[in-house]
Swiss-Prot record:
Belongs to the class-II aminoacyl-tRNA synthetase family. NCBIfam families: alaS. The keyword Oxidoreductase does not apply. Binds 1 zinc ion per subunit. It is found in: Cytoplasm. This is Alanine--tRNA ligase. The gene is alaS. Its cofactor is Zn(2+). It holds the Pfam family tRNA_SAD. It comes from Sulfurovum sp. (strain NBC37-1). Its main location: cytoplasm. Zn(2+) binds at H556, H560, C658, H662. It is an enzyme of class 6 (ligase). Consists of three domains; the N-terminal catalytic domain, the editing domain and the C-terminal C-Ala domain. The editing domain removes incorrectly charged amino acids, while the C-Ala domain, along with tRNA(Ala), serves as a bridge to cooperatively bring together the editing and aminoacylation centers thus stimulating deacylation of misacylated tRNAs.
Length: 857
């Protein structure tokens, strides 16, 4: 039985629209990862987005919980039901049906023989202790002795401190008293006997800033059912990891380890940890998240290194995780086709991270074990920091290792060592000043919903000022300075998809006033332009886009061709990881395991210029996401696409989902030049390039530089001129070396009580090198050299196997020439201001030597 398909088909038959799983990286600045099925519908529930048609949806959403409020990482592998990545089946009602239908649907799906067909006597439900309505509905289906009431902790759900919220009802499956005997194996306990399989959230209130619950005029439904748990129940196993969703991983790990998986073995948890983490790491990599030192990339690294460490415990000493990717593709590639298309890129990134950690893990574990010998109850926080900072052990990996030994960590000492270092993982992902969560954008959204973007067709339009916000994003009737404007129709493109926001001007009709448009951004699906000038609500204006848009479009279209060119030259594993397109340059980040060679860069550049020279018309079509995928369009994870998408193609060269503006024909791009290729992070490369006017300016600048080089080398063939100069430099270096050698040969050596002594003034050469050569030549020697530099003097001393200490010698002699200095016993140097005193200094240096070597001191 395909439970995922059965669930989705059931709710589609009930009028729900099938919505695809949204990315694990949500379009929400307050979340690090998508952790529930309702995340992609959040704006609908809060009223910031309109209710769709139909007003009900169903989905199978991949979710990740590895930090913050919902953090299952510590339990993964050690319990039967916890995972970092899991699939949440859900049905949603947006001000449509409510408790009666939600409970009826759930009961039918759980118990009807056409669907899950679970025994009625095994089903228990919970409701909020104040929710008599839900209690009375459930009485129609199940005996009252199996309806339990609990308080806010267990049966009340809220999105945040304020906003939509409400009681919830959870459906539990009793796995049988004969299998579970813990005190926690009761309803409401933490045991595994009563397994929660479905949560029905009744969003019927809105909590205000005072904490008061106000009834919503149109309540909604949000439900979530864990696919992994239901599959285990239907397959008659009492551990999610023993279901068909995980056993193939455990079997493959057994092959790699050389020991089959055995649940009763002491190390069985390590098999389960690896199986779970393989899924989450693969999905994150496939969706464009890369290993990093902070943010989402650091969470990815934590999960990966936790899995590697468990492989180490099983005896694995070389990369192994990447060898499990094919098993994942076999199991989940049909539902999530991007896993198959990006499998090689996933393997490459995994293997690189494994190689990196395997280089340090053994030394780190050795340090950990050594410190453990000196530990009774509390592990040294400074050592934990060293494991983190030097050996790449994430903090929670060290805590995981300590938990196995029942030892706690001195976290205060660890935090002190961290000091000003940036926190590597945060409970909540913080965006860059998300103004939409603090300003009056919601008021504009409620009043106007959206505004019309006409910038694809024209760069100039007569329109009206619908609303204004001041610099603090507060609604106002007029501005005289900086602020934000919402136009009824706008030709200004709002920053998104890597393309910068448009600039330009507003001209007020019948007035000789121009208002500068500084930037354009999107807030709650509204294009707002930042302006500077005097403007009032209701003003009729002429909106004109800055001519720089033409160059921006060239760079954006060139980016599409560059993406296609990289895939053509380097391979299909190339996936976009970020981009920037403005009027002067483009920047493109992409997944690739190593630096590009000069030959590869040249080939990609030539590929793009070839497509430009073919004058390929740009074509734009609106189609469904499925149609776009069938057409071969490349989509980006993290980008928010609606039911219909805009597909931009340039013949067979490039086809991508894109909302940006582009040239009409590739020939308009002009010359394309790659200016730099560099690394961004592990497995991510960056290309910087220019085209159009910027490329022409670059060629002019290079031509001028070439002219200057010709002038400097006095040769119209600069390559030949430079070669000649290099030969001259080589000759001069040889002459200098000969002069230095001759100078060294002229040094006069005197033997004083068996010690070779040299005290002289030299005219040329590097006196430090000379002293090194002298020390290499003799078994014992004391040497001091002086060299005149204009009115000043340099002096240096060396000693090898003699009673003379070079530092003391220099300190005694340097003041004679108006200087000071010092150094080691074997070498010291100084500078002096009075070169006229060199002769005196030479004599005093010899006297100093004689006194020591002849026993006078």
């Amino acid at each position: 039985m395909d439970i995922r398909k059965t669930f989705l088909d059931y709710f589609q038959s009930k009028g729900h629209k099938l919505v695809p799983s949204s990315p694990l990286v949500p379009d929400d600045p307050t979340l690090m990862f998508t952790n529930a099925g309702m995340v992609q519908f959040k704006n609908i529930f809060t009223g910031e987005a309109p209710i769709p048609n139909p007003p009900r949806a169903t989905s199978s959403q991949t979710c990740l919980r590895a930090g913050g409020k919902h953090n299952d990482l510590d339990n993964v592998g050690y319990t039967a039901r916890h995972h970092t990545l899991f699939e949440m089946l859900g049905n949603f009602s947006f001000a449509d049906y409510f408790k009666e239908d939600a409970i009826a649907y759930a009961w039918e799906f759980v118990t009807d023989e056409k669907y899950l067909d679970l025994p009625v006597e095994k089903i228990w439900v919970t409701v909020h202790d104040s929710d008599d309505e839900a209690y009375d509905i459930w009485k129609k289906y199940i005996s009252e002795d199996r309806i339990m009431r609990f308080g806010d902790k267990d049966n009340f759900w809220q999105m945040g401190d304020t906003g939509p919220c409400g009681p919830c009802s959870e459906i539990f499956y009793d796995q049988g008293a004969e299998h579970f005997h813990s005190e926690e194996d009761v309803m409401g306990g933490e045991g595994d006997r009563f397994l929660e399989i479905w949560n029905l959230v009744f969003m019927q209130y809105e909590r205000d800033e005072k904490g008061t619950l106000n009834p919503l005029p149109k309540p909604s439904i949000d439900t979530g059912m864990g696919l992994e748990r239901v599959v285990a129940i239907k397959e008659g196993v009492f551990n999610n990891y023993h279901s068909s969703l995980f056993m193939p991983f455990l079997e493959k790990i057994g092959e790699l380890v050389g020991k089959p998986y055995d649940f009763d073995a002491p190390n069985s948890a390590s098999y389960r940890v690896i199986a779970d983490h393989l899924r989450s790491v693969s999905f994150l990599l496939a969706q464009g998240v890369n290993f990093d030192k902070e943010g989402r990339g650091y969470v990815l690294r934590r999960i990966m290194r936790r899995a590697i460490r468990h492989g180490y415990l099983l005896g694995l000493r070389e990369p192994f995780m990447y060898k499990l990717v094919d098993t994942l593709v076999d199991l989940m590639g049909k539902q999530y086709d991007y896993l198959a298309s990006r499998a090689e890129a996933i393997k490459t990134s995994m293997k690189m991270e494994e190689e990196r950690f395997f280089e340090t893990i053994e030394a780190g574990i050795k340090l950990f074990n050594e410190e453990l010998k000196n530990t009774q109850d509390v592990f040294n926080g400074e050592v934990a920091f060293k494991l983190y900072d030097t050996f790449g052990f994430p903090l929670d990996l060290t805590e995981d290792m300590l938990r196995e030994k029942n030892i706690r960590l001195d976290i205060d000492a660890f935090n002190k060592k961290m000091e000003a270092q940036k926190a590597q993982s945060k409970a909540n992902w913080k965006g860059t000043g998300d103004a939409a969560t603090t300003g009056d954008f919601k008021l504009l959204k409620e009043e106007f919903n959206t505004n019309e973007f006409v910038g694809y067709e024209t760069q100039e339009v007569t329109t009206k000022v619908l609303a204004l916000l001041d610099e603090n994003f507060k609604k106002t009737d007029a501005i005289n300075g900086k602020g934000w404007v919402l136009l009824e129709k706008t030709p200004f493109y709002a920053e998104s998809g890597g393309q910068v926001g448009d600039k330009g001007k507003l001209e007020i009709r019948n007035e000789k006033l121009e208002i500068r448009v500084l930037d354009t951004k999107k807030f709650l699906d509204m294009n707002l332009s930042e302006v500077e000038g005097k403007l009032s609500v209701g003003d009729e204006v002429k909106a004109v886009v800055d001519p720089s848009r033409v160059e921006i479009e060239k760079h954006h279209s060139a980016t599409h061709l560059l993406h296609a060119g990289l895939r053509a030259i380097l391979g299909d594993h190339i996936a976009q990881a970020g981009s920037l397109n403005d009027d002067k340059r483009l920047r493109f980040d992409f997944s690739h395991p190593k630096a590009m060679t000069a030959e590869e860069i040249e080939k990609v550049e030539a590929w793009v210029n070839d497509k430009i020279s073919r004058a390929i018309p740009r074509k734009t079509e609106i189609m469904s996401v499925d149609e776009a995928k069938k057409a071969g369009a490349m989509a980006l994870f993290g980008e928010k696409y609606g039911n219909e998408v805009r597909v931009v193609s340039m013949g067979d060269a490039s086809i991508e989902l894109c909302g940006g503006t582009h040239v009409d024909n590739t020939a308009q791009i002009g010359l394309f030049m790659i200016t730099k290729e560099s690394g961004v992070s592990a497995g991510v490369r960056r290309i910087e390039a220019i085209c159009g006017r910027a490329a022409v300016e670059k060629v002019k600048a290079l031509r001028e530089e070439l002219s200057q080089i010709k002038e400097e080398v006095k040769n119209q063939n600069p390559i030949a001129g430079i070669a000649k100069l290099k030969e001259q430099i080589k000759t001069l270096k040889s002459e200098v070396a000969s002069a230095m050698s001759a100078s060294q040969k002229e040094l006069s050596t005197v033997n004083v009580n068996g010690v070779n002594v040299i005290v002289e003034e030299v005219q040329t050469g590097d006196i430090k090198s000379m002293i090194d050569d002298v020390k290499n030549k003799y078994d014992n020697v004391a040497v001091m050299l002086f060299q005149k530099k204009g009115d000043k003097v340099l002096l240096a001393a060396g000693s090898k196997n003699t009673p003379i200490k070079a530092g003391d010698w220099i300190k005694a002699i340097a003041p004679i020439v108006g200087g000071g200095g010092g150094g080691r016993p074997d070498f010291a140097q100084a500078g002096g201001k009075d070169a006229s005193r060199i002769t005196t200094a030479l004599e005093e240096a010899k006297v100093y030597l004689s006194e020591i070597l002849e026993g006078g001191n």
